[in-house]
Amino acid sequence: MAEFTQPLQRLVPPPGMDGSVVVRLRLIGQMEAWSLTSENVLPQGRKTRALLAVVALSAPRPALRGRLAELLWSRRPEEQARASLRQEIHRLLEALGPAGGGDILSVTRDHLSLRSDAVWVDVDEVMRATVEQPASLSLLEGDLLEDLDGIDPTFDAWLAAERERVRDKARSVAEALALLQQLAGKSRLKGS
């Protein structure tokens, strides 16, 4: 869907966005992050992008700092991994700054979280898809975080599980839709 590969340049927000959303985050396909003023707020570094993605996909629960350090720096000693995490948090807040970084990302001593009312995430829309509301499945143009493979072995394992979770949801809705269409077709044939 072309509207999700370009910055938001129209007054009508994509499905699922309301007036309180200030950042639109695309995690399916190549990662993108746009403010509502069409400013690119995607962090430059891959680790910083991965950090943003993990925090976004952890919602509505906060992402624990220890888990984030383990996912992104599994080959480093814990203290070094936590120091690297602090640097990446700083970079993430800097990148999100034009959209109100500190108001969007909550950072505490133990965890990080995104304000769900301030950030629209394409994966959230897909995960809310139902047989009655299947339109968000059209957002599935590519794999989840397809440009973030190879960051860390632990991250790669986490990413594989997340990709499977998104695929399973899409598959179950698509199969249910196909079954409904098949049943509707049989019922029309019987009524003829």
Annotate each PLM feature.
Residues 68, 92, 166:
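Residue-level signal for inorganic ion chemistry
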Residues 27-49:
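A structural micro-motif at secondary-structure boundaries
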Residues 1-23:
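Actinobacteria-biased recognition of intrinsically disordered, low-complexity terminal regions
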Residues 4-5, 17-18, 41-48, 54-60, ...:
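Intrinsically disordered, charged and Pro/Gly-enriched terminal/linker segments
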Residues 89, 93-100:
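C-terminal flanking helix
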Residues 62-70:
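Short acidic, hydrophobic short linear motifs in intrinsically disordered regions
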